[in-house]
Amino acid sequence: MKNNSFDFLLAFLSEHKNIFVHTDITKAVNFKFEKGFFLKKHLDFLSKNLQDSNLFFPSFNYDFLKNQVYNIENDIIQVGILNEFIRVNYSKFRSSTPVFNFISLDEPSDYKDQNTSLINPFDRTSIFHYLYESNSAYFHYGSDFSTTTLIHYVESMRTNLIYRYIKCFNGKIKSRNAKSSVSLLYHVKPMNFYQKYDWSKIESDIDRQGLLFKFESGRTELKAFNVKNVVDFWLKSLSIAPLYFLDDKSRINVLNKINIENTQLNMSDFE
């Protein structure tokens, strides 16, 4: 049986070259609140205990989908106050992908941020593929398992994804010295159509496989896994059951929508 102690989790994480860290300080390590120092305590904890790994933090901002502009330097992070604190005060790098970008304390040494005018945030040029190809861990530092964006990378690797469709969002990327026109292309779920992931099953399945490492005490919930091991397990599960990620009601909805002539959902069916 896996050891679910705090030290065992940190030891597991420290084995990895890269760690992608989702954060929610309401369920992270329980530090005493001190105004002006609280967020720094969390960053210091991560930096000290994972000092031999490269730490990446999601810096997602969804405004590009509405206003067609991604400003690399100025767009705030919409997925965690700790992440935004790091961006404003300590980050030295932010990736150029609209919506699904990330920050790091130092510029990555071997990840190449080379977006073209046509961007798929989950393809083989993405940070998620880099994590898959390198020795990387995915760490939920208090964040809910349902924030595992890696699931969309797995879906993008499937050639027969039948419950989402590809949509293109045109816009511009702005930085201090440049502006470029781009098209963001990725799979989206249908509007006004019930479709939800079965996160409880997804999490419990990788736990039963011995792939999930966690520490839970009081309100603290820390969870981690090796990216490649979990991606490979999910790909195998999808090859057996293409609707594996979905809950029961969603699977029924999708199966009722498609037919012999229409073997997957299309944008024209909903927009």
Where are these regions (language model features)?
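N-terminal and secondary-structure boundary signal
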Residues: M1-E271
